[in-house]
Structure formats: C-alpha cells, structure tokens
Curated annotation (Swiss-Prot):
Cofactors demanded by this protein: Mg(2+)
Positions of substrate binding: 18, 235
Quaternary assembly: Homodimer.
GO process annotations (BP): pyridoxal 5'-phosphate salvage
Protein name: Pyridoxal kinase PdxY
Catalyses which reaction(s): pyridoxal + ATP = pyridoxal 5'-phosphate + ADP + H(+)
Length: 299
C-alpha cells in the first residue's frame, strides 16, 4: 500500500505596481501570466486608472504611498509573509512609493530571508526619454536597485542607471556587469536587459540579455512592426522572467522561455491588430511555447 504524497502549494509573489481596468500594463500585465505559471500573486496597486496613459487620456486615481504599507500590514496580519518567495515592483511614480516598496521588500525579507526582489526600474525608453519625475532615476538607482536580486532595465534604462552608452554587445555586457555590482550581496545579482537593439546585431531582430556571475546569455527574436509600440511588454517580460526563474533557477532557461512566450504574445497582437497586448489569448504559450527561441551563451 502506497501513501499519497502531500500536495504542493503554489509559491507566492507580492507584486507592487499600477493597475488598469482596461488593457494590460503594470499588475494587469503581470498578474495573469504569473498565475498561469502556477503562482499565487498578492497584488498591491499603486494607481487605479481606466486605461494606460499611452492613449493620452484616462480616468482614475493615484494612491498614496501609505497604502502600500497599510495593505502589507493587512497581509502580514494573516501570518503569510514567511511564505512569500519574491517581490516584484514596476512603475514607481513618486519618492514616497519608492520608499514604500523598499520597506515592503525589507519586511518580506525579515519574514523570509530567501525571498527574491525583482525590480523593473521603469524610468524611460528610447524615443521617449525619461518619462518619470526628474528625481526618480536617482532614487531608484540609490534605494531600490541596491535591494534587488534581479533587475530588468530596458536598454535606455541600463544607460541611465550606469551612465554608459550601449550600442554594441560588449558595451551591453560591461554596463550590465557594472549594474550587477550594485545589486544586493547574497542574491543571484541577475541583470536582464530588455529591448536591446545594437549596431553589431543582425538586422530585423530585438534581443534580451541576461547577465549573472556565472555568465551571460542572449535571446534574439524577430522585431515585429508594431506601430505604435505596445504598452505593457516590459511589465510582462519582468513577470514572465521572474516566474520562469523561480521555476527553473536557471537564467538561460528562464530567458529562453520568457522571451519565447513574449514573442508569441506580440506576434498574435500584431496579427490581430489590437492596441492592447493579447495576454489572455496567448496564455498557452507561457508554459509551452509553440516556437522556442534559444538563449545563446555569449560570455
């Protein structure tokens, strides 16, 4: 007679980001992919808007930073913080929100020292420049990034965080290693550079680079002609990478799976021609991508 094995509960992730009622940015881009990967997600929303600001008009409210601490107090009162495997943060619109997120990370780590913090340092992008308040890049660099185990800047944000110009692969590697040196000691110190377009890459592609202490991996996908560029892709890739990294504990594998999933989302979005990314319609791609883009070791 054999005894049945005990059920395995999902890992828990605390995600502190913006929220929109319509469309997919912030937590509305991170929540479902993480759930589809098998995680429980505790969301704390920093804003509640009707839609993302890329439309030029929206309704809703920005929540006070104190709400982050208040909601975390309520979660902590349930006695579950020791079960939190990771914290994910995205757009932080004020100095108070940066401080509140950093304090939330510290409280989770007090309860579970093994918990990871994945910081998506949303500050700007190529073609748009810095789109947050002028004081925020320095605050994110000096307060949030040093607490992070994983950081997911786009190419523009990598340059902003390091003060280095990135146009070639070696420059991207050097800047990523420089940024790695500022992350929290004791963690994986993993830098994931998204939306990488470099002079020495093949034409018609876009890349993501993952750099750890053990090496570096590059994943390349076709560059789809999405005009205008779709909002929420950075939020989605940060969530997908974190989820796959927690599942595999391997940066190269997580990079390949997350980029393959994101390409499928964007390819479907392009084919149907919608302004919002097709996160729900492409959900099967999160766990079993129909087209796998391998991560090539480059260092």
């Amino acid at each position: 007679m054999t005894s049945s094995s005990a059920p395995v509960l999902p890992q828990n992730i605390l995600s502190i980001q913006s929220w929109v009622s319509y469309g997919h940015v912030g937590n509305a881009a991170a929540l479902f992919p993480l759930q589809r990967l098998g995680f429980e997600v505790w969301t704390i929303n920093t804003v509640q808007f009707s839609n993302h600001t890329g439309y030029g008009e929206w309704t809703g409210s920005v929540f006070p930073p104190e709400l982050v601490a208040d909601l975390l107090n309520g979660i902590a009162a349930r006695g579950v913080l020791p079960t939190c495997a990771a914290v994910l943060s995205g757009y932080m619109g004020s100095e108070g929100t940066v401080s509140a997120v950093v304090e939330a990370v510290r409280r989770v780590r007090e309860a579970n020292p093994a918990a990871l913090y994945c910081c998506d340092p949303v500050m700007g992008d190529v073609g748009r420049g810095v789109f947050v308040r002028p004081e925020l890049p320095d605050l994110i660099r000096t307060q949030a990034v040093p607490e992070a185990d994983i950081v997911t800047p786009n190419q523009f944000e990598l340059e902003l965080l390091t003060g280095r110009r990135v146009t070639r692969l070696q420059e991207a590697l050097d800047a990523s290693r420089m940024l790695r040196g500022t992350l929290r000691e004791g963690g994986p110190r993993l830098v994931v550079v998204t939306s990488l377009v470099r002079e020495d890459a093949p034409q018609g592609v876009i890349e993501t680079l993952a750099v750890t202490g053990e090496g570096a991996w590059l994943c390349r996908t076709p560059l789809l002609p999405l005009d205008p560029p779709r909002n929420g892709t950075g939020d989605a890739i940060a969530a997908l990478f974190l989820g796959h990294y927690l599942r595999t504990q391997d940066a190269g594998t997580a990079l390949s799976l997350s980029m393959s999933a994101l390409f499928a989302v964007l390819d479907l979005t392009h084919r149907v021609g919608t302004r919002e990314i097709q996160l729900v319609a492409a959900q099967d791609e999160y766990t079993r991508p129909s087209r796998v883009f391998e991560a090539e070791r480059v260092a």
